[in-house]
From Swiss-Prot:
<dbReference type="Pfam" id="PF01167">
    <property type="entry name" value="Tub"/>
</dbReference>
<dbReference type="InterPro" id="IPR025659">
    <property type="entry name" value="Tubby-like_C"/>
</dbReference>
<protein>
    <recommendedName>
        <fullName>Tubby-like F-box protein 6</fullName>
    </recommendedName>
</protein>
<dbReference type="InterPro" id="IPR036047">
    <property type="entry name" value="F-box-like_dom_sf"/>
</dbReference>
<dbReference type="InterPro" id="IPR000007">
    <property type="entry name" value="Tubby_C"/>
</dbReference>
<dbReference type="InterPro" id="IPR018066">
    <property type="entry name" value="Tubby_C_CS"/>
</dbReference>
<comment type="similarity">
    <text>Belongs to the TUB family.</text>
</comment>
<feature type="domain" description="F-box">
    <location>
        <begin position="50"/>
        <end position="105"/>
    </location>
</feature>
Amino acid sequence: MSFRSLIQEMRDEFGSISRHSLRSRSHRGGGGAPRVAAVGPAEAAAMQQSCWAQLPPELLREVLVRIEESEVWWPSRRDVVACAGVCRSWRGITKEIVRVPEASGKLTFPISLKQPGPRDGTLKCFIRRNRTTQTYYLYIGLTEALADDGKFLLAARKCRKPTCTDYLISLDMSDMSKGSNTYIGKLRSNFLGTKFTVYDAHPPYDGAVVSKSRSARVVGLNQVSPRVPAGNYPVSHISYELNVLGARGPRRMNCIMDSIPTSAVQEGGKAPTQTEFPLSGLDSFPSISFFRSKSARIDSATSQLSTQKEEKLVLKNKSPRWHEQLQCWCLNFRGRVTVASVKNFQLVASDENGPTNQEQDKVILQFGKIGKDLFTMDYRYPISAFQSFAICLSSFDTKIACE
């Protein structure tokens, strides 16, 4: 019997026990006379949860560990998420078992999209662009193909304003408004499209300072937890330099990662890691459920002191080489990019960060075109899927002063 069948059988069994217990309490009265007991939905849910919680912790942990190890990738990975939704005890053990992407190389819960990518290897994703609606959708690949059906991760919508352009990023592909409970941040450009700022809707580290931008506002109390300040927390600044060759030449870009210290790419370094969403409305989004405790936590290794005193990590685009026979600028994307485009880039740690030559050669983020309105996005530690997606969105924007 598969683990999935086992879980389903156990769930059905405990569900029938709970229903039988409720019927007995509702129809059994003194002297055999039927009576109606005051059993509400909350009590029924509590009784059913107690049945699940009565499993021996050692047995439960062993079962959940095997499920986590066997269901390594989507769509079967959803079984791990389902286990976290059974009851409180199952949720606690599942969250202990599931490791962050930095160590496991897996995306399980929505918070994984705010956590640094794997140290060993990359997470291979792709972006679909809809020109008509000016929307962008990020997926993680399910196969070795450059693009497949994919597992949806994030969505963004382009919003033009008189002096700037915003890209609103959401966990929900059908609702990309800033007032939505699934809104997690945005990318904002200046009028010329040469400078961009990535804003996180949640504190990226302990002590993060919210931007005093006029656009920063607190949405309805029914959408935002009153314990957590809502606003724009700058996590990255992206700049594109003037291109003397115009549209024919490669772009030059720099990314200052405000929330990541330089030491993150050095031996023994650590990048800030969000562990929970502070918004009460982010309990779930399509195909993935998320569960939070009463407070939002940040990894203790990424305190305000360590982040503010250290220099910020700087990423720069890897310089392409001119191919005389092809008459174009080339980068080695290792087969992940197939169409020449000025949007294509690879980001590495800048030499001003002082990393070793080996670390400096590692491509942290690469983005490139593979078809009409279809692009690959591969990222790794120390940046997250959210940060990577926002940086890639900046490549789509028109750059008046650079080209």
